[in-house]
Curated annotation (Swiss-Prot):
Its cofactor is Mg(2+). Pfam families: Hydrolase. InterPro entries: Enolase-ppase_E1 (IPR023943), HAD-like_sf (IPR036412), HAD-SF_hydro_IA (IPR006439), HAD_sf (IPR023214). It comes from the Bacteria. Binds 1 Mg(2+) ion per subunit. This is Enolase-phosphatase E1. One of its GO terms (molecular function) is acireductone synthase activity. It catalyses: 5-methylsulfanyl-2,3-dioxopentyl phosphate + H2O = 1,2-dihydroxy-5-(methylsulfanyl)pent-1-en-3-one + phosphate.
Amino acid sequence: MSMPQAILTDIEGTTSSLSFVKEVLFPYARRALPDFVREHREHPDVMPWLDQVANETGTAFSEEALVATLQTWIDTDSKHTALKALQGMIWTSGYQNGDFTAHLYPDAVQRLRAWHAANVPLYVYSSGSVPAQQLFFRHSHAGDLSGLFSGWFDTQIGGKRESTSYQRIAQHIGIAPAGIVFLSDVIEELNAAAQIGLNTVLIDRRDDYPTPRHLKDTDRHLHLDSFAQLPF
């Protein structure tokens, strides 16, 4: 696999550990939700998302009901766009207050910097909201890496397991699918990307997946333990 024209990467389990997201970010947002909803429910950036949650779930528009729904979604790792938007707003204060810094694997940091230096456009596609993605890379333990990226995509462009989402991303960045490499730890996402012609790499880190994965469709993708093994 030669140097691609563009690289699209996932975050959780790919550039960064699953444990940081599940053991630090998710619990932080869960704890903060009651106060956040009470204090910001009328804010113009917050109200549309709360309205969406209430309308889609038939939940009475009360603080308690909304918080309970959102906390349940956190517990079940829902990828709902409204939840991700609200989580991103909550994490803003956590990053700014120094309550935590984002984890990045050293091999990912090294390769991201090298690709940027080689003028390869880098993009993020994550279920987390675009503002949350930008916060993540701006407040990482490796420093502010947000400037390495040329663009950001979240589920407002479509679900990560839907091939049409990757078609939209390719059209947005103006590069044919065959010129893009997508890096992820989720096989279903890689299958969707491969379906429309993206080159795909399964990142199968031992820190996140102690037993190497040899599941259905694994062999459809380049299967590596880390960014250090990438051939470009």
